[in-house]
Amino acid sequence: MSSNCTSTTAVAVAPLSASKTKTKKKHFVCQKVKLFRASEPILSVLMWGVNHTINELSNVPVPVMLMPDDFKAYSKIKVDNHLFNKENLPSRFKFKEYCPMVFRNLRERFGIDDQDYQNSVTRSAPINSDSQGRCGTRFLTTYDRRFVIKTVSSEDVAEMHNILKKYHQFIVECHGNTLLPQFLGMYRLTVDGVETYMVVTRNVFSHRLTVHRKYDLKGSTVAREASDKEKAKDLPTFKDNDFLNEGQKLHVGEESKKNFLEKLKRDVEFLAQLKIMDYSLLVGIHDVDRAEQEEMEVEERAEEEECENDGVGGSLLCSYGTPPDSPGNLLSFPRFFGPGEFDPSVDVYAMKSHESAPKKEVYFMAIIDILTPYDAKKKAAHAAKTVKHGAGAEISTVNPEQYSKRFNEFMSNILT
């Protein structure tokens, strides 16, 4: 099952690049015709499909309440001989959206406007991330880094259907204030007879603050170190033992720690009730002083580049500006923030370090990978690991109740 993969469902702003957007002029080119140009057909189909389904939904009145059938519903379209724009889109493809009314309702509860969501996915092609699950799970981010697009398996789609009603009810009850993944859309794309399933979530990390270090934490210490291959990446995903061996702590202060752990406990109890396990806490750390230094270096380079571009009369785009063949956007221009500042309505998982912390940091923390039920395969894996490591070892495949308890205890110990 693809859910056995460990993966990172957040995409960080790459160091030494995010700050370019502050100094470069932004030229947003509004196109009369949308051209869903991307480096590969599957992404063009995703852009076309999200654009189509959001447009269709805009004509459907918002119901007073969701009905049981909404959790089984889908919309699908088959496109044949699509001659218009054929240099970008395949001539034949199919696009299916699962539970459109439910995900529209979830987007609203998470404070995400459908027009903004549509623009983020369709205005410019999604960007590949170097984050990848062991089973080849693929991650992309929308051009503005606000949303993450993840390929999933048909089993994951089935599990989403299994939990969606209870997940939606939980989001209603907590008013969208949760550390759980914010599921915003689920799709099936068929190109050349190959089916690809994709889920869109809010990015855990900031769309503008650089993440300098990140961790995938499960509360388990058996085989929980980053591989040498992972460590060679620009922004490796470190694990539990790496975190402990570094003596790392997240300095949030007593009040923030209390509030965070209360939210975490509620979320994790919900997952245990659903018999879900193997989830992680994804942690990203933004070093404010380091970011300021990087920004100064980037600004110097950006000014030189701007002079060169202005010299040849070309309009200079910011790192996620509109290419000349992309649809325009209604999103407002980003506000300017001071070092380490963020908009809590956008960076919903962000938390500042306490003023007494040794370094000024911003932490991004959320639960990821919640589509792993405790089924027969997990029970067999648990038995095998218990034989290998002993009954007392902190292996990752324990039952959901044990997993949630251990998870909460570990997270309580890393916050200070």
Swiss-Prot record:
Binding residue positions for GTP: N203, V204, K214, D369
Example of a GO cellular component annotation carried by this entry: plasma membrane
Modified residues (N-acetylserine): S2
Family annotation (Pfam families): PIP5K
PTMs per UniProt: Ubiquitinated by the SPOP/CUL3 complex. Ubiquitination is stimulated by PtdIns5P levels. Phosphorylated on serine residues.
Positions of region (Required for interaction with PIP5K1A): 64-70
Membrane topology recorded in Swiss-Prot or TrEMBL: Peripheral membrane protein
A GO MF label: 1-phosphatidylinositol-4-phosphate 5-kinase activity
Regions crossing the membrane: none
Ranges where the PIPK domain occurs: 38-415
SUPFAM superfamilies: SAICAR synthase-like
Keywords: Acetylation, ATP-binding, Cell membrane, Cytoplasm, Endoplasmic reticulum, GTP-binding, Kinase, Lipid metabolism, Membrane, Nucleotide-binding, Nucleus, Phosphoprotein, Transferase, Ubl conjugation
Any one GO BP annotation for this protein: regulation of autophagy
Phosphothreonine, modified sites: T8, T322
Reaction(s) catalysed (UniProt annotation): a 1,2-diacyl-sn-glycero-3-phospho-(1D-myo-inositol-5-phosphate) + ATP = a 1,2-diacyl-sn-glycero-3-phospho-(1D-myo-inositol-4,5-bisphosphate) + ADP + H(+); 1,2-dihexadecanoyl-sn-glycero-3-phospho-(1D-myo-inositol-5-phosphate) + ATP = 1,2-dihexadecanoyl-sn-glycero-3-phospho-(1D-myo-inositol-4,5-bisphosphate) + ADP + H(+); 1,2-dihexadecanoyl-sn-glycero-3-phospho-(1D-myo-inositol-5-phosphate) + GTP = 1,2-dihexadecanoyl-sn-glycero-3-phospho-(1D-myo-inositol-4,5-bisphosphate) + GDP + H(+)
Known role: Participates in the biosynthesis of phosphatidylinositol 4,5-bisphosphate. Preferentially utilizes GTP, rather than ATP, for PI(5)P phosphorylation and its activity reflects changes in direct proportion to the physiological GTP concentration. Its GTP-sensing activity is critical for metabolic adaptation. In collaboration with PIP4K2A, has a role in mediating autophagy in times of nutrient stress. Required for autophagosome-lysosome fusion and the regulation of cellular lipid metabolism. PIP4Ks negatively regulate insulin signaling through a catalytic-independent mechanism.
Subunit structure as annotated in this protein's UniProt entry: Homodimer. Binds TNFRSF1A. Interacts with PIP4K2A; the interaction suppresses ubiquitination by the SPOP/CUL3 complex. Probably interacts with PIP5K1A; the interaction inhibits PIP5K1A kinase activity.
Alphabetical list of PANTHER family matching this protein: PHOSPHATIDYLINOSITOL 5-PHOSPHATE 4-KINASE TYPE-2 BETA, PHOSPHATIDYLINOSITOL-4-PHOSPHATE 5-KINASE
Identification of the protein by name: Phosphatidylinositol 5-phosphate 4-kinase type-2 beta
Underlying gene: Pip4k2b
